[in-house]
Amino acid sequence: MSSYANHQALAGLTLGKSTDYRDTYDASLLQGVPRSLNRDPLGLKADNLPFHGTDIWTLYELSWLNAKGLPQVAVGHVELDYTSVNLIESKSFKLYLNSFNQTRFNNWDEVRQTLERDLSTCAQGKISVALYRLDELEGQPIGHFNGTCIDDQDITIDNYEFTTDYLENATSGEKVVEETLVSHLLKSNCLITHQPDWGSIQIQYRGRQIDREKLLRYLVSFRHHNEFHEQCVERIFNDLLRFCQPEKLSVYARYTRRGGLDINPWRSNSDFVPSTTRLVRQ
């Protein structure tokens, strides 16, 4: 269990509780979770973070009424900056989006501006929102993470409790390498409900070579770990930076969707540019 799982900042969340669904616009449904909850135990300070990045959200169940009452549908793309005070809690995001369903808006841009304003207010940070008509995305290919997949290893694993022990002495040699490693075996659990979160992760680094078996064992140790998606990615970045000490590091996870939303956080200390095309499980 995470050290802050019972923090008072989480007590008021609708997550894990029975809720009524509202279909008329209500910005108060949005709830934020302070990023400091997981950053403080990691020794990460808001004014001196070792990374930059965004939380990329895809909104698959977004609908509202136009001025004449005709339903509209769109796919939304949201990027929340890593410097925001709060992350957006996903169940509250879903409930908030449901409140658009029977609400009339004059045009698409009004919807976009409303989303941008409300999400920025909740997160207390910079955010960008784009809305796409379905025909703009039809035929878009399924993407994949570039890099070497480390999953096909003939190893025995019998420990699924989170530990950084596997990263001890996980680098070897003095030669500097630059490589991208990928795993589809990332599984963590919701901080509150403990429901499973499934993801693929891409780790791009420059530095002493990281032992792939030790890295895979470390990633598998998240299997019983309870944290939000964004928190897991920051923990992985921080652990790799601390134990492996790469010159450059980027960590990017794309999680499967739940409630019509998928969350795809990335953190980097280099000029990393994430691919935003959905993966096969998304």
From Swiss-Prot:
Primary location group: cytoplasm
What SUPFAM superfamilies does this protein's entry cite? Tetrahydrobiopterin biosynthesis enzymes-like
Keyword Phosphoprotein on this protein?
no
Localization, per the record, is: Cytoplasm
**Key word NADP present in the record?**
yes
EC numbers, comma separated? 1.7.1.13
Q: In which pathway is this protein known to take part? A: tRNA modification; tRNA-queuosine biosynthesis
BP-aspect Gene Ontology terms? queuosine biosynthetic process; tRNA modification
Q: Where does NADPH bind?
A: 90-91, 258-259
| Assembly | Homodimer.
Q: What does this protein do?
A: Catalyzes the NADPH-dependent reduction of 7-cyano-7-deazaguanine (preQ0) to 7-aminomethyl-7-deazaguanine (preQ1).
Protein name (record): NADPH-dependent 7-cyano-7-deazaguanine reductase
Lineage, broadest ranks: Bacteria, Pseudomonadati, Pseudomonadota, Gammaproteobacteria, Enterobacterales
Q: Which gene encodes it?
A: queF
